[in-house]
C-alpha cells in the first residue's frame, strides 16, 4: 500500500503522515515513512540545495533535480519497501511536481507528466491525501512554526502559492478516485480522523489484493 500526502506550505502533511503511520502500526501493519525530496542520501543533499533560500535555480533545473530525487527514491526506498509488504507513507510525490513546477512555475504540463513517468516507472500511489488549506493561512502557520525564516519555496509570492493550490485542485478533479481532499483547517485530530476513515475503507475494500 502506497499512500502520499500533498498540499501547500503549512498544511500539516508531516504531522498527519506521522499520525497515520502510528495508527497503521497499532493495526499490525509494517510502515515505512519517507519524503520527497530527502528520502535518500542523495535526496538529502538535493533537498538542502532546493530549499536553501540562497540557491538560485532556474525552473527547468529545479524540475530536473526533483525528478532526479524521485528516481533515486523509488529505486532505493519505495519499490523495495512495497516489495517487502510494507505500507509506504510519503510526504510529497509526483503531484507536487505538477502543482509547484507546472502550475506554480508555469512549466509545460506535458513535459512534467513525461518526466514523472520516467522517474516513477509508472508507479502511482494507491491513495493521495490533499491537505486542503487556504495558501495565505498555510504560509502564516508555516512561518510561525519555523521562526519566520522561510526557505526558498516558502519565500515565493502569495500568487505563486495560489497557483500551486489551483494545481492541486485540478489534480483532485482529474483523479477523484485516488486523490482525496481533506480539510486541513480543522483541528489536527479532526483532520486525522478524516484520513483514518478513508484508509479504513480502502483497506476493507482492497484487503485481498493487498495480501497477494
Curated annotation (Swiss-Prot):
A single Gene Ontology CC term: cytoplasm
A Pfam family assignment: Thymidylate_kin
Lineage: superkingdom: Bacteria
Reported function: Phosphorylation of dTMP to form dTDP in both de novo and salvage pathways of dTTP synthesis.
Origin species: Gloeobacter violaceus (strain ATCC 29082 / PCC 7421)
SUPFAM superfamilies for the chain: P-loop containing nucleoside triphosphate hydrolases (SSF52540)
Keyword Transferase in annotation: yes
Family affiliation: Belongs to the thymidylate kinase family.
Name by which UniProt lists this protein: Thymidylate kinase
Entry binding sites for ATP: 7-14
Main EC class the enzyme belongs to: transferase
Gene Ontology biological-process entries: dTDP biosynthetic process; dTTP biosynthetic process; dUDP biosynthetic process
Xref: InterPro entries: P-loop_NTPase, Thymidylate_kin-like_dom, Thymidylate_kin_CS, Thymidylate_kinase
Key words, A-Z: ATP-binding, Kinase, Nucleotide biosynthesis, Nucleotide-binding, Transferase
Molecular function terms, GO-annotated: ATP binding; dTMP kinase activity
Gene3D superfamilies: P-loop containing nucleotide triphosphate hydrolases
Catalytic reaction annotation: dTMP + ATP = dTDP + ADP
EC number: 2.7.4.9
Amino acid at each position: 500500500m502506497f499512500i502520499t500526502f500533498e498540499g501547500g506550505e503549512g498544511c500539516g502533511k508531516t504531522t498527519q503522515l506521522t499520525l497515520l503511520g502510528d495508527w497503521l502500526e497499532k493495526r499490525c501493519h509494517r510502515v515505512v515513512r519517507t519524503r520527497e525530496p530527502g528520502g535518500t542520501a542523495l535526496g538529502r543533499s538535493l533537498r538542502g540545495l532546493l530549499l536553501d533560500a540562497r540557491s538560485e535555480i532556474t525552473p527547468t533545473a529545479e524540475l530536473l533535480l526533483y525528478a532526479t530525487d524521485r528516481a533515486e527514491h523509488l529505486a532505493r526506498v519505495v519499490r523495495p519497501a512495497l516489495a517487502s509488504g510494507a505500507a509506504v507513507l510519503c510526504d510529497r510525490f509526483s503531484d507536487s511536481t505538477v502543482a509547484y513546477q507546472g502550475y506554480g512555475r508555469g512549466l509545460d504540463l506535458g513535459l512534467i507528466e513525461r518526466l514523472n513517468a520516467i522517474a516513477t516507472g509508472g508507479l502511482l500511489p494507491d491513495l493521495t491525501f490533499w491537505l486542503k488549506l487556504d495558501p495565505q493561512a498555510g504560509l502564516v502557520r508555516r512561518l510561525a512554526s519555523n521562526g519566520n525564516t522561510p526557505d526558498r519555496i516558502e519565500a515565493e509570492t502569495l500568487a505563486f502559492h495560489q497557483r500551486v493550490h489551483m494545481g492541486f485542485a485540478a489534480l483532485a478533479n482529474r483523479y477523484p478516485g485516488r486523490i482525496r481532499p481533506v480539510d486541513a483547517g480543522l483541528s489536527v485530530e479532526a483532520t486525522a480522523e478524516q484520513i483514518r476513515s478513508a484508509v479504513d475503507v480502502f483497506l476493507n475494500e482492497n484487503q485481498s489484493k493487498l495480501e497477494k
